[in-house]
């Protein structure tokens, strides 16, 4: 009897863990210029008021931070905790012109090469299936 109970629990938990890995399509931006390509997606599935932002890094979407501000039809600002290690860095997307640009919120230790910050670039809205 205990063996059936334990087997049933293992079976049910394995289905539950598989269900967590299912991802629905998410909206985001595909931004590029001659030197750089960035892909961002915004996950509002868990919290509509505090969406998580992901950036594709080495083929996988990695959590980079939170949405900081948004005005419908105008702009979106989100942090990127992965771009620099000690400098607070954010991206801005102008919804009117479809331009991505960056903001340095604060310089931490001042050891990072700020010249790697890309110039403003054009973006396209995109639905990501992952």
Q: Across the structure, where does each feature detected by a protein language model lie?
A:
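Tryptophan-centered short beta-strand motifs
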Residues: 21-23, 61, 114
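Contiguous, well-ordered beta-strand patches that form the walls/edges
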Residues: 59-97
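Classical Sec-dependent N-terminal signal peptides that target proteins to the secretory pathway
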Residues: 1-21
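N-terminal glycine/threonine-rich, aromatic-flanked beta-hairpin/loop signature
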Residues: 38-70, 98-110
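Short, solvent-exposed loop/hinge segments that bridge or flank secondary-structure elements
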Residues: 25-56, 83, 87-95
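Edge beta-strand at a domain terminus
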Residues: 106-130
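N-terminal helix-cap/turn-to-beta initiation motif at the start of protein domains
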Residues: 18-30, 128-129
């Amino acid at each position: 009897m205990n063996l059936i109970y334990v087997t049933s629990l293992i079976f049910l938990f394995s289905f539950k863990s598989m269900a967590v890995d299912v991802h629905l399509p998410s909206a985001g931006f595909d931004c590029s210029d001659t030197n750089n390509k960035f892909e961002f997606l915004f996950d509002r599935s868990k919290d509509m008021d505090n969406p998580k932002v992901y950036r594709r890094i080495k083929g996988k979407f990695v959590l980079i931070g939170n949405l900081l501000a948004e005005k419908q039809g105008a702009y979106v600002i989100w942090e990127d905790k992965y771009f620099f290690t000690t400098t607070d860095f954010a991206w801005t997307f102008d919804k009117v012109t479809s331009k991505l640009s960056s903001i340095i919120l604060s310089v931490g230790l001042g050891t990072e090469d700020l010249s790697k910050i890309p110039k403003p670039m054009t973006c396209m809205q995109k639905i990501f299936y992952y």
